[in-house]
Amino acid sequence: MARPPVVARTLPALRRALGDLRRRNASVALVPTMGALHDGHLSLVRLAKRRATKVVVSVFVNPTQFAPHEDFGSYPRTWKADASKLAAEGVDLIWNPDVKTMYPEGFATRIEVDGPAVAGLEDRFRPHFFGGVATVVGKLFLQVRPDVAIFGSKDFQQLRVVTRMAGDLDTGVKVIGAPTIRERDGLAMSSRNVYLTPEERQVAPTLYRAMKETAKQLRAGKSADASLSVGAKMITAAGFSLDYFEARHADTLAPIHSLKAGPIRLLVAAKLGKTRLIDNVAV
């Protein structure tokens, strides 16, 4: 039977626990999360176990990536269920700090990332977001000092931002993107899916179907503008309010206009009722 994970809530406790792991010459993988864990998160843990001998999962709802009008206060917090799931997966250490531990009084430092963070996608609608993400992930990398860190590809722009930050700051952390995990009907798993009404939940998979159809059109040789128009019409006809639906270079997130531009990623964000969903697919 697997040993239950150590739970650290203070920096001294985290350092002691990490010291115990490192004394065994362990390689360490970090899986940063905000809790409300689902099978998508657990797939990251399983990948982490394949990439390192010890796995640390952080559970922290990061206030600096939420704007005042967003859902920080109502974001699902399910600590007991999360801890049980992580124990069942054989996680070695859970880092569960509070806000005062991560951002003590007088905290005044922020990491800002250009390039993919200002690609005109999420940053247009959530200009605060990537500075908050880069700052908290930078702190987690310094606190845990992992060899590898696992992030889901559903938040594709975030993955690119974190990868750039990790490289630019010489963290020594290898950032690995894991495949998006989907429900049987194609909806990308997300902690925010719980906000959907039963009726909206039936409509939500249209987002993925529209992206697949757009990718099909692109592969058939149609222009990016024409292909995206087809997908956008599918999305809005289903009742979504579209924030963006774009074809970008998969590595740089630069706008593209043909398949010859390099590897392509379709990225979308749209609101269904009060719930904002994001997703992406490779072409």
From Swiss-Prot:
Species of provenance: Rhodopseudomonas palustris (strain BisB5)
Catalysed reactions listed for this entry: (R)-pantoate + beta-alanine + ATP = (R)-pantothenate + AMP + diphosphate + H(+)
Annotated Gene Ontology cellular component terms: cytosol
Enzyme Commission number, as recorded: 6.3.2.1
MF terms (GO), sorted A to Z: ATP binding; pantoate-beta-alanine ligase activity
Family membership noted in the UniProt record: Belongs to the pantothenate synthetase family.
NCBIfam families in the cross-refs: panC
Annotated binding of beta-alanine, by residue: 65
Binding residues for (R)-pantoate: 65, 158
UniProt signal peptide: none
Binding site for ATP: 34-41, 152-155, 181, 189-192
Pathway in which this enzyme or protein is active: Cofactor biosynthesis; (R)-pantothenate biosynthesis; (R)-pantothenate from (R)-pantoate and beta-alanine: step 1/1
UniProt miscellaneous comment: The reaction proceeds by a bi uni uni bi ping pong mechanism.
Keyword Heme assigned: no
Active-site residue list: 41
Highest taxon in the source lineage: Bacteria
Compartments in which it is found: Cytoplasm
Annotated keywords: ATP-binding, Cytoplasm, Ligase, Nucleotide-binding, Pantothenate biosynthesis
Name used for this protein in its record: Pantothenate synthetase
Known role: Catalyzes the condensation of pantoate with beta-alanine in an ATP-dependent reaction via a pantoyl-adenylate intermediate.
Quaternary assembly: Homodimer.
Record flagged with keyword GTP-binding: no
GO BP annotation list: pantothenate biosynthetic process
